[in-house]
Structures are given as C-alpha cells and as structure tokens.
Amino acid sequence: MIEVRNLYKSFKADTGKKGLFGAVKESFFAVNDMSFSLDKGQVLSILGPNGCGKTTTLRMIAGMLEPSSGTAVVNNIDVRADKHKVKSNIGYMTNNTSLYDRLTVIETIKFFAELNQIPVEIYKKRAEELFSQLDMNDYLNKKIADLSTGMKQKTSIVRTLIHDPDVVILDEPTTGVDITGQSIIMDLVNSIKQQGKTIIFSTHQLGEVKDIADKIIVMAKGKKLFDGTTSEYQAKKPNHSFNEIFTEITSG
C-alpha cells in the first residue's frame, strides 16, 4: 500500500534579474500538495505534460528526493524515516536510463543483481523470464552504447524488476520506444499487475492507461487536477476519448 499526504517540493529558479549580491532567484513548487492512496495490487497512472511534476513526485515516493514537506508511506514504512528499507521494496525506473555504455545487456543485469546481493540462481531465472517477455534475447551480448533507445528502456526495465520488488515505479517506460515495443512493455506491466504488484507509472501515451490503470492522476504545473478511478475519468465525458478528456482537464 502507498499513502501520500500533502507532498510539496520547491526549487529555486533564476529570475533573470540581478540583485545587490548577484542573480535573483525565486522559489517555485514543482509539486504542490500531492495526496493520494493506492492499495496493494493496484495500478496508478500519472498523466501530465513535461515539467508538470510527475518525475519529482515519483522520486519522492521512491526515496530518491527529499520532500520540502509532507509524507509518503510505502508498505507501512515512512520514506523519510527509513529510505534504505523502502528502496529495498521498490523497483524504480527513472526516465533517464542511466546505464553504463561499456557493458553488455547481460553484464548490466549481472552487475546490478550482484550489487544488490541477489543470489545467482534467482536473478538468472528472473532475467531469462524478463528477457523473453520483452523480446530481448537477440540483444543480450550487445553493448549498451550500441542499443536503440527502445532497447535501452527495456534493459532498464529488466534492471528495475530483477529483484522482484513489491512496488514498481516506472517513469515514462515507453518513451522513445516504437509501437510494437510499447505494446510489449505494457503487456509486461499487465503481467506484473496480475502477480499482485503495486505499480505507479507515468506516461504521455494515454492509450496505455485505459486497459491497465485502476486509478489515474492528472497533473499540471505541480498540482493535481484529477484523482480517481479509470471509470470515473471516463465518466467525466462518456462520449469523449481519453485524449479529449485529458485536454479538457489540463486546459480548465
């Protein structure tokens, strides 16, 4: 279960003005009063344009970024109180794959698994299953530097799931992936949903949301504009597409 209450995150930005002691900066809220709850086994999709606060929200929940105020509780553990324990229960894929170019796909997964002290017999079996599900078997000995953006995304997903986490957070997992690859990735997300994992994923692809997400949050300029079930989202405009509803929410 995930419980987020009144999360705020502020940063300082350059105003372009000069003061007595140099550049004048102003604070702004990248995330402004985010609250929601997610039960075990549910899937939440966070939607919104670039810069709306999706990534900042996910990083705070995953314990990668300290909130300015507010709380995030994952599986009854306060993230701010015990980041290490929370991180051991979470698989977090950033929207920047952050892979080592000189390593092959196999070496990348082995390195991450050993770093997290996952027994060989466990991570090998898990990796084989994920490679097969993501249609990656022809690329396992290729260096990261030689992979397409889509294949790098898939490698990052395997790295995220290799320790079989209870909670999975995916930040725009299909970015830069072709249509076939998007379908393969979302099939995997649906598969891990069936295993009872709790999942949060952000996306620009509204078509990915309808058949997988149990709940939807729409963000703009750091604020939550909609929070409800997929059915409630569609019920706002029963005869309109997901895209049309999204446009109405974010332009209101």
Mark where each language-model region is.
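Helix-to-loop junction immediately C-terminal to a conserved catalytic motif
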Residues: A62
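Conserved ABC transporter NBD signature motif
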Residues: G70-A81, K85-V86
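Conserved ABC ATPase signature
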Residues: K143-L147
